[in-house]
Amino acid sequence: MSENQNIPAIEMRGVNVGAMRDALFTVIEGMDWSMASGEFWVIAGQEHSGKSDLLMLTAGLMPPVAGSYKLFGNDTRNFGEAELAERLRVGFVFQGGNLFNQLTIAENIALPLQYQKDFTPAEAQREVRALLELMDLSPLADVTPSNIAANWRQRAALARALILQPEILLLDNPLSGFGARHSNWWLRFLDQLSRGQGQFGGKPMTIVVTADDLRPWQNAHRKFALLRDNKFIPLGTWNEVETANDPVVKELLAEPVELTP
């Protein structure tokens, strides 16, 4: 847990976010962002705007090209093996799940526990079973990812990200390709996490999601930002999003989606 509630969970100053395609280039320039613990941010943008790259940087999986990024007040430029515990306070759900096909669903979920030496094998098994049940994944525990549908793979990836009970949860386009039923499940579940309800009750979880479509995420308690023209543009609340005079925002709002949070 963060010792000082006044310290932002995420703080970026003058950050340039890089991406590796054929060569390294900058996709976001001069980014300033401060996110308090317990906030829920939705970062929208068109394809190749840098959404996934920003989440990779936020998770500590790659460094900024320029600028400073502090995670719970600690400068990530100074992170080494000793700071692994700080990175474990962040859970990451990749778009598509990014599970290991040679492992079962239960084994995939258990993977992060290898970094936690406090867990006995019996305790680890209990944690995995609890998450399997919570995600309705118990019947698929011994199945490999390639043999289940995409929506269940994505749930398993979420369970893996939650196994260490992170303080920050990052999700890359979690509603992509899902119909209303599965999307509604995600919206309800993330809303519970952000409010500190359910199995992870007690403290609201800090959540960042990326999105191609803003409509499903409308909620008065969430904050929104846009990636456009290599810039990170805070939009504010949902009311401010709806009244924003920005052509990209209008495009992301163009097609209403009948989903309920």
Named regions from a protein language model:
Residues 102-111:
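Short coil-to-helix segment of the ABC ATPase nucleotide-binding domain corresponding to the Q-loop/switch region
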Residues 122-140:
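Conserved ABC ATPase "signature" region
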Residues 231-254:
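Conserved beta-strand-loop-alpha-helix hinge in the C-terminal portion
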Residues 76-91, 115, 121, 244:
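ABC ATPase NBD coupling module
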Residues 165:
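Conserved catalytic motifs of ABC-family nucleotide-binding domains
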Residues 144-148, 152:
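Conserved ABC ATPase signature
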Residues 59:
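Helix-to-loop junction immediately C-terminal to a conserved catalytic motif
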